[in-house]
């Protein structure tokens, strides 16, 4: 729990306190979206059934308040994603980095999101999840998704460039995603 509290205190320190944000958790089915949301909500790991209906959680941690939407990742759920684009502040796109056979499908969906006019100025945090069970390097992961040029992991402001960055993580082992959310906090 100490790491969890520390993470949110850092976000507050970075200036994301007393702000409200709407964040979409997107990605193919079985990428870990619901598991990540559960860990962020109450710090516990649980087993989840596939998400067949959109769910949302109001999370208030430290001085940060955001509404997170988990929209599901199976093919029929993906058709509903666009209904949630208006007024979104950030996208967290999770990919199962151990399922290399699904990288093409993940890239197709990510490319569709990145080409949406409604999301043109929305920061994207790409999480390569499940690094604890796969052997995909960040370089191979980036290359598979065509993301060799991204914003950079520091606080970088580039005029006219949408913030987008890749972080490798394991939600189950609880590492990597905190750095990603710290990066995302710079752009909310």
Curated annotation (Swiss-Prot):
UniProt binding sites for Mg(2+): 29, 70
GO cellular component: COPII vesicle coat; cytosol; endoplasmic reticulum exit site; endoplasmic reticulum membrane; Golgi cisterna membrane; phagocytic vesicle
Gene3D superfamilies reported in the protein's UniProt record: P-loop containing nucleotide triphosphate hydrolases (3.40.50.300)
Activity: how regulated: Small GTPases activation is mediated by guanine exchange factors (GEF), while inactivation through hydrolysis of the bound GTP is stimulated by GTPase activating proteins (GAP).
Annotated catalysed reactions: GTP + H2O = GDP + phosphate + H(+)
Pfam families tied to this protein: Arf (PF00025)
InterPro entries recorded: P-loop_NTPase, Small_GTP-bd, Small_GTPase_ARF/SAR, Small_GTPase_SAR1
Binding residues annotated for GDP, in chain numbering: 30-35, 129-130, 132, 171
Region called Mediates recruitment to ER membranes, residue ranges: 10-14
Motif STAR per UniProt: ranges: 2-4
MF (Gene Ontology): GTP binding; GTPase activity; metal ion binding
Enzyme Commission code(s) on record: 3.6.5.2
One example of a Gene Ontology biological process annotation: vesicle organization
Compartment(s) of residence: Endoplasmic reticulum membrane; Golgi apparatus, Golgi stack membrane; Cytoplasm, Cytosol
UniProt keyword annotation of rRNA-binding present: no
UniProt topology in membrane: Peripheral membrane protein
Residues at which GTP binds: 30, 32-35, 129-130, 132, 171
Top-level taxon of origin: Eukaryota
UniProt keywords, alphabetically: Cytoplasm, Endoplasmic reticulum, ER-Golgi transport, Golgi apparatus, GTP-binding, Hydrolase, Magnesium, Membrane, Metal-binding, Nucleotide-binding, Protein transport, Transport
UniProt similarity note: Belongs to the small GTPase superfamily. SAR1 family.
NCBIfam families from the UniProt entry: small_GTP
Protein's job: Small GTPase that cycles between an active GTP-bound and an inactive GDP-bound state and mainly functions in vesicle-mediated endoplasmic reticulum (ER) to Golgi transport. The active GTP-bound form inserts into the endoplasmic reticulum membrane where it recruits the remainder of the coat protein complex II/COPII. The coat protein complex II assembling and polymerizing on endoplasmic reticulum membrane is responsible for both the sorting of cargos and the deformation and budding of membranes into vesicles destined to the Golgi.
Subunit structure: Homodimer; upon association with membrane. Part of the coat protein complex II/COPII, composed of SEC23/24 and SEC13/31 heterodimers, that it helps recruit and assemble on endoplasmic reticulum (ER) membranes at ER exit sites.
Protein's name in the database: Small COPII coat GTPase SAR1A
Naturally occurring in which organism (per UniProt): Dictyostelium discoideum (Social amoeba)
